[in-house]
Amino acid sequence: VIGKDVVIGSSVIVKNSIIGDRVVMQDNCKLGQKGFGFIPLKNKNIKFPHIGKVIVEDDVEIASGCTIDRGSIDDTVNGKNTYLDNQVHIAHNVRIGENSIIAGQVGIAGSSIIGNNVKIGGQAGISGHLKIGNNVEIGGGSGVIKNIPDNTKVMGYPAKNIREFLRDNKWYIKQPL
């Protein structure tokens, strides 16, 4: 299902998806593909079935080369007024709240929940099954491996509160370029 006033760039593939109104999908986006889920057995891995959908709510922009996997059982949801920069990957069952901005080359692993008004810097990675609160800012290149509460700014690997990060790395910050 594709809503009203949707812009679809070249080589975009949309399957198993519900697209809201006024959505922009730039070139080479792939939505609704099977996610990366396996059941590991002793001598073999069996692909886990994906029967959920991708839901893109109204007024979302998805830049070039983004991929959004369909949910395994639940849906993968991109909230209203959210912007995904180039080459962002959203894995199965991820839920992104409203008014969020996600910069280029971010990867969000399966079943993570991203709150409203979240900003994620480029090349950050978010591990699976995490909860990122509302009004959170994640610095570029950060590696998020634990939940982040509301109204928090983090950066680094592992991602930590920005004040703690700056205190721990002040020697590095003072180095000449």
Q: Whereabouts are the PLM-identified features?
A:
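Long, leucine- and charge-enriched amphipathic alpha-helices
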Residues: 160, 166-177
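Structural signal for interior beta-strand "rungs" in well-ordered beta-sheet cores
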Residues: 1-161
